[in-house]
């Protein structure tokens, strides 16, 4: 039978392509593009809000940004583009006409100062003045180069941060962390501190603005006016911290944490109360419409009266993905923190839409804004939390909480109600195994499908028969014989102490036959590369793999750890001394390690590095990879970082059970091409033959064990084939199954 299947939209994402998800909530800057749109810079990238239809378009590094942490933004009406400043000191210009980014990196290479964040821009003709954390830089637009850096202003210390810059009345004026400084534009040597007149202000100057012929400065103590003699307080203006300033032809807008104050040209004030405690920047259009960049709500649009419209792009609450896991429905869950300290919520991605969770109630303890581990059982998604116990979400997102008040779970020694469940794993019988951290006894729990919860670890039977009382359980995995591999720490939860392997011998209700063995860095006790084990995974061949503070290790035969002598772990030589935070194993049995230096991909046997992904050679959001999750059904690899979630589409898709229909894409296949043709729908270890219309064998493509193979359009001699019709014939490893599909090749 001939199956001719062309590429549906389902396969629009090609193997090797990336997608990034970031939070657009924490806004740093805002700029108005004429009258049609507002641009917002955030610590997750850039977005454009169309004021006419409400449409939001987002930009990350994949769409052309140099990086995602934006710190400054200015619309250049003369060039119809955006000047974008980044935390790193990089500066980009985004031309709106052709949507092209030009990036200038000179300031990132300044080594004299540690902080190089861009704070503000001021455009004047061919000059762009750039306020930075170490001073003021002059960029000549036509020459596309930085001409000078000014780092000393009058009596202020060298490298004082500049928060804003303004040119008015023949003066170059800078707002700094120590106060205000000004110099004449006619000066021939602005690098000389003596050319600058400085005015110290306690708390510094936050922003500058000009209204008519008057120059104003925002300070921690209210609004200041700059005169020939210096700075003086604006009469009648309240003495409070002014965060930001903006102007129209008539009005000056001053933003404080509790109100927006409008100063008219005649000096009168109009005050509008509001909660602006998280606001950071302010912009207005020609009609006086106000737009505020906010740390929590992203963009606030102030309407008539007291109306405030909140514009928040659909995105996760935070860019911190300390945890990333996938449930049985293919939904992606991320958590801002492993622990409760510093937690900023957790989030779930389903069908391209994010749902955020924070401050969920847990009776008897503080609200929960994170999770530490996740498993699925039936229609239920079960989350272990740091302090809140166990959270169960059903298919309708109804929440059930199990904690100290209604279950056997025990809190930490200092607080019985603070139940820490940092790791969950589910066995083939549907039993959810749970690590209970920092408890005085019974650090292992089994949550049965019938709802019962059993405790393990403390039996009084002595060494080797119970969990070591001087250790606490942090992370848990299950091997092919249902033994539990538990990464442990010292009794106080601070120091890594290796792994405890627990065997219940298949008798959940009889602890008398339970066995425990400790594996650590000692000879004949496993010889781990480091006792701090950060992740444990079972590979496709039954071996146990570890990610530690000092490299990777594996036990080829996990059963051997209960022998007379514990065999030494095998090490991955190329990852020695590498801090490894996380681990995932794909359908091709490759090992993917997260680290502080990006992602490492190791061969199935651990003998070679196949690939490495960093911010320098890929769209990976950050080299600080905290967690990795893998979806076997789609081949997607998810990398949780401190700057968001990166997704790589890989060829490692779980193979089909039976070989029936093949899908070919792209079809027709135009060669030469930068992309490859994909044959999809294979069983494990299938072989694909490319055959010409006359029956000649053109190429053999062995499967690596996954659902698809790729063809570059070349024959066995490395030459591109001619235009015409070809067939892809797939044969199972045992030769009992086969499938065929037609390929149209167009050679250009």
Where do the PLM segments sit?
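Surface-exposed loops/turns
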Residues: 67, 722-723
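Bacterial Sec-dependent N-terminal signal peptides
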Residues: 1-17
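C-terminal tail/sorting-segment detector
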Residues: 727-748
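Carboxylate-rich, polar loop motifs that coordinate divalent cations or form catalytic acidic clusters
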Residues: 12-662, 697, 729
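Terminal processing/anchoring signals of secreted or surface-associated proteins
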Residues: 12, 651-655, 664-667, 679, ...
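Short, glycine-anchored, charge-dense loop/turn motifs used at functional sites
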Residues: 687-698, 726
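Glycine-centered coil/turn sites that cap beta-strands in beta-rich domains
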Residues: 656-689, 703, 708-711
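Glycine-centered tight-turn motifs at strand-turn-strand junctions
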Residues: 697-721, 732-736
